Amino acid sequence: PKEYLKLKTKLIRQSIHGDEEKVRQREAIFEEIQKRFYDQLPEDEQVAVEVLQAIDDVYVSENAEFGEGLIEEYFEQTMLRTEYSTNDLLLLYLYFLSLAVNAERDEVTLNKVCLTIVSQTNYDDTNYIHLLQRVLIGLVLYQLDIDYHEFIPEILSMLREIMIDIGDTSLKPTVDFIEAKYYLYGEKDKEKALQYYEKAINGAEFLNDMNFKNRVIEEKNKDFP
């Protein structure tokens, strides 16, 4: 149904930056989907809704148990694919978010996913692209988390390429912020890191995203006391 797709699009495109108002809005969307559409949806759409809900639950509660059942049931199939579907991307996001919350390392899966994901070429569907960007960002943040930098440059350049391709730079401050972290911790290049921090702060201000701007300033002050 058209209305359902509208709601799903909203859930996919909006990230939650720990903002309570957004969390409440998203909960309302999930409730509406459950009430009005869920029972009539085809199975793969039901799975998409469940995974989206689990991602939010894990993110907000910092408890990875919310995603365990879905990962157990579907993740193995995702790992066999060379072309990721929307649901595969959602599962990957859930998987690496859960690892990050549990502070677990899984380099084997990380390597396999990174090698597959950089060869994705399906840029036709805007929802898919938004999701791909979020997964790529999640993969970089996870690598920074576990101090493993092998795929970061490649993924960052892929993110920049996608932004140019689709003419949407709303994620640029996020990518600049991650680039700052990478230069600081991956390359030990403080000067470059500071440049990217400045870019991220100015970019967030330009987009009027004060929540993110303040978060970046906080991180910068931690990294450069």
List where the protein language model places each region.
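Intrinsically disordered, low-complexity basic tails/linkers immediately adjacent to helix-turn-helix/homeobox/MYB/SANT
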Residues: 4-15, 21
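Long, contiguous interaction/recruitment modules in multidomain scaffold/adaptor proteins
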Residues: 1-6, 80
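Long, low-complexity regulatory tails in eukaryotic proteins
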Residues: 156-225
